[in-house]
Amino acid sequence: MSQGTIVKVSGPLVIAEGMRDANMFDVVRVSEHRLIGEIIEMHGDRASIQVYEETAGLGPGEPVVSTGAPLSVELGPGLIENIFDGIQRPLVKMREMVGSNITRGIDVTALDRSKKWDFQPTVKKGDKVTAGDVIGKVQETSIVEHRIMVPYGVQGTIEEIKSGSFTVEETVAKVRTENNELVDICMMQKWPVRIGRPYREKLPPNAPLVTGQRVIDTLFPLAKGGVAAVPGPFGSGKTVVQHQLAKWADADIVVYIGCGERGNEMTDVLKEFPELKDPKTGESLMKRTVLIANTSDMPVAAREASIYTGMTIAEYFRDMGYSVALMADSTSRWAEALREMSGRLEEMPGEEGYPAYLGSRLAQFYERAGRVVCLGSDGREGALTAIGAVSPPGGDLSEPVTQATLRIIKVFWGLDSSLAYRRHFPAINWLQSYSLYLDIIGKWISENISRDWETLRSDTMRILQEEAELEEIVRLVGVDALSPSDRLTLEAAKSIREDYLHQNAFHEVDTYTSLNKQYRMLKLILGFYYSGKKALEAGVSIKELFELPVREKIGRAKYTPEDQVNSHFNEIEKELNEQIEALIAKEVQ
């Protein structure tokens, strides 16, 4: 343990002398208050420390003690349904200790040391095990089975394994290694947050992460193990999009990081999630969620840690063979924390004052996502999908954080303030956004939902692009100057926008749409467009076409409950065909 003394305090940055034996990224305890900090720069025996708690009142001469270990998180039963701060201190436990206002210098363990968990072994004495092998299971919540794994670097034969109720620190198994050492295994592991957890092999994504949000699943889908960014100006709905994805994405585990955003937004999550039911299991959404709250009024340095803490917890569940979705809201606040610390370290600034290493830090974060073959002899697969919100000032997508993010991610959902002001939510601009997973996911949907999905999707995008071109003409000469065919295109685009892409996050049916219902809705809206073209060719007037009674039913189709989709949509399709045929027959006479 290395001990030094403070020589300078500058906001969250503390400089200490006499730290020659300390190492980069060691956790230190600063002053008599024992504040948690991390060494981020070394010059001889001088260490620059970013402190994760309030530094007011600190002064030169106070002691700094290095623990000799990097910033690590505790991984084991008790993570699910919990809410932590950026350095994995449980906020519920802290509230019990000091009340609602967090005071500094609190030392509390992340996992409850007194709670007993029912451990059921899945291996027996004499079995050979290697790092990553599942040796037992704990039913953590009614829907999450926590798999206890052999820690990294341990390999050998099971010498002893127990069954029953244990705390996370009690030994549940003993492994005799090849060097004849006896290693105790408990239900808890520790892992340094800045180092990605190892896996055997990285695989390309092969299936969609179904979110239930029509504009995402249909036009700009995200794959399990993929990376996406949601940039947008203030008030365009980034947080609601993130909440919707956290609620309805078909992942087994959701890790939600509130990094430098408003405290009220985390309150919304805490209030809504326990009341909402998971469409797959019918259980509360909190039973599969881990929350990390690092709101804008908490110390800046802890924002950087919160992103890594969340990613490490997500990787741990991925290693069990689960599909995990990680939401980071917002990576811009994290980048601002990097900029502040870089400025205090007097480093050479890059573009707009951000440090020159901004791009590499963002890449380190996003590259930890992916679909992998986990460590262990059973060859199980896990997937970690990362979705980061970006808050560019004034909605300027050319600023450094957005540009650095765009170089890394494969799905871009660009939020548009003009759509938000028109009350069109989710305000994802269909002309700016893109997804590079279309080929993989199109193939999966063609095999599992319908073969004409890709045709419907490409026709939808074509109609929306044609609408953007026609809008310019309409502004100049008015809609009446257009040909009937162009007017039909405009009407179809309006129907796609208002009846399909627009989705009410607060309506109990419309908030989530299954892939089958999305396919039926799109087929119905485009069915009107295709039939309308035939009717126009047969001489039907555009006015008669627009006044068809079935059009109101098409507009209300999104409110059809999931269990009535096939019967209700078959009826509407039948009505549409009958009414179009009646118009054509009338013209022929």
Curated annotation (Swiss-Prot):
Q: Which residues bind ATP?
A: G232, P233, F234, G235, S236, G237, K238, T239
Any keyword Iron? no
Q: Carries keyword Disulfide bond?
A: no
Q: Which Pfam families match?
A: ATP-synt_ab, ATP-synt_ab_N, ATP-synt_ab_Xtn, ATP-synt_VA_C
Q: Which GO terms describe its molecular function?
A: ATP binding; proton-transporting ATP synthase activity, rotational mechanism; proton-transporting ATPase activity, rotational mechanism
Report the domain of life of the source organism. Bacteria
Which InterPro entries does the record match to this protein?
ATP-synt_VA_C, ATP-synth_a_Xtn, ATP_synth_asu-like_sf, ATPase_a/bsu_AS, ATPase_F1/V1/A1_a/bsu_N, ATPase_F1/V1/A1_a/bsu_N_sf, ATPase_F1/V1/A1_a/bsu_nucl-bd, ATPase_F1/V1_b/a_C
What processes in GO biological process is this protein linked to? proton motive force-driven plasma membrane ATP synthesis
Q: Which SUPFAM superfamilies match?
A: C-terminal domain of alpha and beta subunits of F1 ATP synthase (SSF47917), N-terminal domain of alpha and beta subunits of F1 ATP synthase (SSF50615), P-loop containing nucleoside triphosphate hydrolases (SSF52540)
Gene3D superfamilies for this protein = 2.40.30.20, 2.40.50.100, Bovine Mitochondrial F1-atpase, Atp Synthase Beta Chain, Chain D, domain 3 (1.10.1140.10), P-loop containing nucleotide triphosphate hydrolases (3.40.50.300)
What keywords would UniProt list here?
Answer: ATP synthesis, ATP-binding, Hydrogen ion transport, Ion transport, Nucleotide-binding, Translocase, Transport
Reaction catalysis annotation: ATP + H2O + 4 H(+)(in) = ADP + phosphate + 5 H(+)(out)
EC code = 7.1.2.2
Q: Please give the function described in this protein's UniProt entry.
A: Produces ATP from ADP in the presence of a proton gradient across the membrane. The V-type alpha chain is a catalytic subunit.
Regarding protein family, the annotation reads: Belongs to the ATPase alpha/beta chains family.
- Name it: V-type ATP synthase alpha chain
* Gene responsible for this protein: atpA
